[in-house]
């Protein structure tokens, strides 16, 4: 039995009782990485020397009264979250040699909680992708079946947790990039409310949509991690000054009287039968615990995909303009003048998907098209947000599938961008509205690949979605299933 089969609270107790050491936890992580990483390919960079030194330092503090629950816990960090002195590439060749000189706020907070960073996790380049096949280095595989994708863009973050390489990880979610891979890999992933977690130190893809969040084996562990990284940050102007409650207090298993909305659009055309049936089965479980549900409509969700790709690509075209070979990152050697420097550095450094989205965004923002595309997309975004607010006036949570289908095979969709984009049709509306949502395991498809249940909450009401997710988790055994890698 792996130490990582235990929860954070169980491991904390073992540490305090001196049944295990922090070094044991770190070595457990690196041993598992040595055993499976050649197949899974979840990591881009390991930090073994520093992690082992930190573990030794923390071992001397075991049993101290001020040790928090995350003390000594091994974590993986998505490679678009900057880490001081530890290579951060965004899985792009253009940043292949980039060593940041500061820590992201979330990394600072986790260091203050005495977690130990095991390494940096693979992803789709600059978080643009749904399968991890867009990594500029190599594709991560799904631990449940190496022939399948782990999802994206936080594919490495989800795969590392599912494979037992780390206890938990950080990902980022712009249009589903935490929840979708969490669903595909059979783990728990939360996208917090926009502004709940500081984005300072997150390399920007689409600044009005990006959010950092936790990926874990259980809902309880997820709540511990969100508790540690949430809160106002003066370094991030979009960070919200909203009180962070006690997420653990609501994990009682009680959902009696809870009002659940189920959008008909989330169970209709484009959603596979396996995903639909798994959600209906989950609703029966929650009904049996005293919750009620009704079908509702989110009428503008059908426009979410087009809206998202116009807005996110527009923001990306601006955000990625800084990668020009002048200030940091890789610089082309094939240069005769300044224009060559810009053009060749970006042509050689960016992958196809990143180039595709930069071009789309530049077009949407260009003179003569701004009103027709970008401005109209912003107006539709407001309508989508209003849809959610109208539903939440009468219901506590919204529930549906996280993805239309289980994970697909490696190479199956990589040459068809539109089919690939459709994997995010159920997660994107949440980002456009800025509300929080969690994915928890809720079954398996015919290919024995995991399915995820998406629970969506009101702005800054992560506590309620944790309560529902935890109640469902404890009433079922899906969270106990493990990839047999």
Curated annotation (Swiss-Prot):
**Keyword ATP-binding applies:** yes
Q: What reaction(s) does this enzyme catalyze?
A: L-glutamyl-tRNA(Gln) + L-glutamine + ATP + H2O = L-glutaminyl-tRNA(Gln) + L-glutamate + ADP + phosphate + H(+)
Pfam families given in the database record = Amidase (PF01425)
The EC number(s) this enzyme carries: 6.3.5.7
A GO cellular-component term linked to this record = glutamyl-tRNA(Gln) amidotransferase complex
Q: Does the keyword Cell cycle apply?
A: no
Domain of life of the organism in this record? Bacteria
Q: Which residues form the active site?
A: 78, 153, 177
Sorted alphabetically, the keyword list is: ATP-binding, Ligase, Nucleotide-binding, Protein biosynthesis
Q: Which GO terms describe its biological process?
A: translation
What are the protein's GO molecular function terms? Answer: ATP binding; glutaminyl-tRNA synthase (glutamine-hydrolyzing) activity
- Self-association state and partner proteins as the record states: Heterotrimer of A, B and C subunits.
Question: In UniProt terms, what function does this protein have?
Answer: Allows the formation of correctly charged Gln-tRNA(Gln) through the transamidation of misacylated Glu-tRNA(Gln) in organisms which lack glutaminyl-tRNA synthetase. The reaction takes place in the presence of glutamine and ATP through an activated gamma-phospho-Glu-tRNA(Gln).
| Stated family | Belongs to the amidase family. GatA subfamily.
Q: What is the protein named?
A: Glutamyl-tRNA(Gln) amidotransferase subunit A
Tell me which species this is from: Bacillus cereus (strain AH820)
Originating gene: gatA
